[in-house]
Regions:
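Active-site and adjacent substrate-binding regions of carbohydrate-active enzymes
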Residues: 1-410, 414
Length: 414
């Protein structure tokens, strides 16, 4: 478990920490009884290095699973190119056994799959059909615009793989094939997580006549304010810039594609801390952001805790943070490049992914009512005042405002 479950070792099983397949089947059954649909996270740009495919792939150069992954010869004792990983450091890992490098755009324990291989693609499609046969209602496709790479693997400017591994040359071919092989004529929802996607590309992915996806998660509004050290460097931005981005996507996909609307997810800081005010105007700014989200055209996505106004957390010790992105960025920027500890910690407080990953705050009992045991990461200390129980019977609460917003959105769309 190197990246909180995004390093998958078995596509047809449930991660131990979350229970068993029997538990999942019961969850699906009970949700469907209540007219709640379940969308699965589909992570098929990469697997875990503990997946049986990769274990076989690294055994020898002529193994039948070798071409399930991206293996390349080095250049003069160096990696095949200068691409950097999303999680800091090089995107290539040397394998002593076969004396070649494998590509990992994320952690070295997350080797990239080789979508150029039709046999690999068919394995993916079979797995997707298996989940649909179980009755799941759709897929959120993790970094799905990374699956097609420029097969020349050229160097990127300052190690940036984006122009060569995002929205690549065969991406539309692969998604159309997936639609035909798996998704066609089924009542499903499909949303692609797509860092770096433009409005023009968004229309190609979600257009009515395109036969690819229902909608995409774009990141443009999430990347606003990035500075010299990316998101770890707090930079001021104008409200008009945020409005410009949101308007661009609203107008750009109108009458053709479809927007997914979100402020929060497991990779982003808490919206009331990021774009609102988590102190004096906590209640009002959280409601303002909810109004903005629900009054745009598209499908709103609400992340756990957003509906009660959960805020960012500021743990004093680096050791209290669990996210591989945070820990690797600290190693790269502070230990190797000399950025100050204080500056980096402020960046973590502002934009770190663990802000979104502290346990849900149900009530004011120990650990926010999340568990009687020891939570995997500390609870935000403000759970005493910000929790579901505190808000559920308060008509003026953020929670009840979200409920009313959802009802209003449903009425408008019916």
């Amino acid at each position: 478990n190197d990246d909180n479950g995004y390093d998958i070792s078995d596509y047809q099983n449930i991660m131990d920490e979350f229970g068993t397949m029997k538990d999942f089947d019961e969850l699906l059954r009970e949700c469907h009884k209540r007219n709640i649909k379940i969308m699965m996270d589909l992570v098929v740009n990469h697997t875990s290095d503990e997946h049986s495919w990769f274990m076989e792939s690294k055994k020898s150069k002529d193994n039948e699973y070798r071409d399930y992954y991206v293996w390349k010869e080095g250049t003069n004792g160096q990696p095949p190119n200068n691409w950097g990983s999303v999680f800091s450091g090089p995107a290539w890992q040397y394998d002593e056994e076969t004396q070649m490098y494998y590509l990992h755009l994320f952690s070295k324990k997350q080797p990239d799959l080789n979508w150029e291989n039709p046999k690999l693609r068919n394995e993916i499609y079979s797995m997707m059909k298996w989940w649909l046969d179980k009755g799941v209602d759709g897929f959120r496709m993790d970094v799905i615009n990374f699956i097609s790479k420029d097969q020349n693997f050229p160097n990127g400017e300052n190690g940036d793989f984006g122009p060569y591994a995002m929205n690549g040359p065969r991406i539309h071919e692969f998604l159309k094939e997936m639609k035909q092989m798996v998704l066609k004529e089924k009542d499903l929802i499909t949303v692609g997580e797509m860092p770096g996607v433009t409005v023009e590309q968004g229309n190609l992915y979600t257009g009515k006549d395109r036969d690819e996806l229902n909608m995409v998660f774009q990141f443009e509004h999430m990347d606003i304010g990035n500075g010299e050290f990316g998101k770890w460097h707090k930079n001021s931005f104008k409200l008009t810039e945020l409005k410009r981005i949101m308007t661009k996507w609203q107008k750009g996909l109108e009458n053709n594609g479809w927007n997914s609307l979100y402020w929060n997810n497991h990779d982003q800081p808490r919206v009331v801390s990021r774009f609102g005010d988590d102190k004096k105007y906590w209640n009002k700014s959280a409601k303002m952001l909810a109004t903005c989200l629900h009054m745009m055209q598209g499908t709103p996505y609400i992340y756990q805790g957003e509906e009660i106004g959960m805020t960012n957390v500021a743990f004093e010790k680096l050791s209290d943070y669990k996210d591989i992105e945070i820990l690797n960025a600290y190693e790269d920027l502070v230990v190797k490049k000399g950025r100050s500890h204080e500056e980096m910690m402020q960046g973590i407080y502002d934009r770190g992914r663990d802000n979104a990953r502290t346990p849900m705050q149900w009530n004011d009992s120990e650990n926010g009512g999340f568990t009687l045991g020891t939570p995997w990461i500390k609870v935000n200390p403000n759970y005493k005042s910000i929790n579901v129980e505190e808000e559920i019977n308060n008509e003026d609460s953020i929670l009840n405002y979200y409920k009313r917003s959802e009802e209003h959105t449903s009425e408008l769309q019916s």
